[in-house]
């Protein structure tokens, strides 16, 4: 993070987006906030019948509670022309088996963002949702099947473009996914979990 901040001449702050007190204290020195990108989160989880309440709460806290924590701390510092961008997931529309908490948390994020938009539009504050399909990150390595995925840079490009949209344009959501057919089809990603299961099957 330090290297990335140095490269673009930015300052970074480490804060827990699921802890109201520590997060509010971390951004306290900031006088105004023009753009908030909620990209904190966790995948994890398991089948509902196997999941403990502690596992459920960990995912909900990271992905959904953090929406409230971040918004409640940042909103007083935002003015007309500023905006929120929430990074959601296609799991909010197409729930993932064995990812009940994750799917529920992302659906909740979308509902939170839409309700927030109804509240802050009169203040000239925009709210956008970026909903990507699979993204090639470390979190994807625990998925037990291969798939086409987009890159983190694809999501970042969408976020950067959204910040250029005129405030008079209402753009609630952008959905991103990898092209699966034709000359621009993405090469399938084979997560580590696929290799682990294949190796285990060979041994047995």
What is each PLM-predicted segment?
Residues 71, 105:
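Active-site helix of classical SDR
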Residues 40-45:
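Conserved NAD(P)H cofactor-binding loop of Rossmann-fold oxidoreductase domains
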């Amino acid at each position: 993070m330090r290297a990335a901040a140095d490269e673009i001449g930015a300052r970074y702050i480490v804060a827990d987006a699921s802890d109201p007190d520590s997060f509010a204290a971390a951004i306290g020195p900031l006088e105004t906030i023009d753009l908030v990108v909620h990209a904190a989160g966790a995948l994890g989880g398991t089948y509902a019948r196997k999941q403990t309440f502690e596992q459920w709460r960990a995912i909900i806290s990271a992905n959904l509670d953090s929406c409230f924590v971040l918004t409640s701390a940042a909103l007083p510092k935002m003015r007309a022309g500023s905006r929120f961008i929430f990074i959601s997931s296609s799991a909010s529309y197409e729930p993932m088996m064995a990812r009940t908490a994750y799917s529920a948390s992302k659906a909740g994020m979308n509902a939170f963002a839409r309700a927030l938009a109804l509240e802050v539009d009169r203040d000239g504050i925009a709210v956008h949702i970026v909903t990507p399909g699979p993204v090639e990150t470390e979190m994807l390595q625990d998925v037990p099947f291969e798939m086409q995925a987009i890159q983190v840079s694809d999501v970042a490009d969408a976020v950067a473009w959204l910040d250029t949209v005129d405030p008079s344009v209402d753009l609630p959501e952008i959905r991103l996914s990898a092209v699966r057919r034709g000359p621009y089809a993405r090469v399938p990603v084979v997560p580590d979990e696929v290799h682990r299961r294949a190796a285990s099957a060979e041994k047995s």
